[in-house]
């Protein structure tokens, strides 16, 4: 597809910087969200990535109406040559992430846990005993209960049925 060279370069620069590219499958979208400041249509992004995919420079995934493209090693080399970048510059997906340093902890609690609140076993036992009175038979009380006369009514949406007598 014919597209301005500035659009192709903007797409390739973003792809090389991030290492991945995401685009919604919408050819009528006026601007790609990540390239909105450069006024690049979403169709140009999709077609440029399709071209790179056919040459084996990106891997494509598609899920939930979105394309996901990942740079391959050959694609990194191609974009480095195309954009005239030195070998020291690498995509964000290949950079090592530094482990985040946590908040500094207070000196007094190193290796220690604060003690739990002391609760006696008596609290637990009284709770368990209060639920079921002693001497009650659980199996005898299971079932429909003390009601011996059942009344059946018409179901939901099945008409009114007969009036009770």
From Swiss-Prot:
In terms of InterPro entries, this protein maps to: Plectin_eS10_N (IPR005326), Ribosomal_eS10 (IPR037447), WH-like_DNA-bd_sf (IPR036388)
Name a GO CC annotation attached to this entry: nucleolus
Q: Where are the transmembrane segments?
A: none
Q: What family is this?
A: Belongs to the eukaryotic ribosomal protein eS10 family.
Report the function annotation for this chain: Component of the 40S ribosomal subunit. The ribosome is a large ribonucleoprotein complex responsible for the synthesis of proteins in the cell.
The cellular location(s) given in this protein's UniProt record come to: Cytoplasm; Nucleus, Nucleolus
GO molecular function per UniProt? RNA binding; structural constituent of ribosome
Q: Where is this region: Disordered?
A: 92-165
Q: Where is the composition biased (Gly residues)?
A: 154-165
Ranges of Low complexity composition bias in the record: 142-153
The keyword rRNA-binding belongs to this UniProt entry's keyword annotation = no
Q: Which gene encodes it?
A: rps10
Swiss-Prot/TrEMBL keywords: Cytoplasm, Nucleus, Ribonucleoprotein, Ribosomal protein
Subunit structure, per the record? Component of the small ribosomal subunit.
Q: What is this protein called?
A: Small ribosomal subunit protein eS10
Q: Name one Pfam family in it.
A: S10_plectin
Composition-biased stretches (Basic and acidic residues): 97-128
């Amino acid at each position: 597809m014919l597209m301005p060279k500035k659009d192709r370069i903007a797409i390739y620069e973003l792809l090389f910087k991030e290492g991945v590219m995401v685009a919604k499958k919408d050819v009528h979208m006026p601007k790609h969200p990540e390239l909105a400041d450069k006024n690049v249509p979403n169709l140009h992004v999709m077609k440029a990535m399709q071209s790179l995919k056919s040459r084996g420079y990106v891997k494509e995934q598609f899920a939930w109406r979105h394309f996901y493209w990942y740079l391959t090693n050959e694609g990194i080399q191609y974009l480095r040559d195309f954009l005239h970048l030195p070998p020291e510059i690498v995509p964000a997906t290949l950079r090592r992430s530094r482990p985040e340093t946590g908040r500094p902890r207070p000196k007094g609690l190193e290796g220690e846990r604060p003690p739990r609140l002391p609760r006696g076993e008596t609290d637990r036992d009284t709770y368990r005993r209060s639920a079921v009175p002693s001497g009650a038979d659980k199996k005898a009380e299971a079932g429909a209960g003390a009601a011996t006369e059942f009344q059946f009514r018409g179901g939901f949406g099945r008409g009114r049925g007969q009036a009770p007598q």
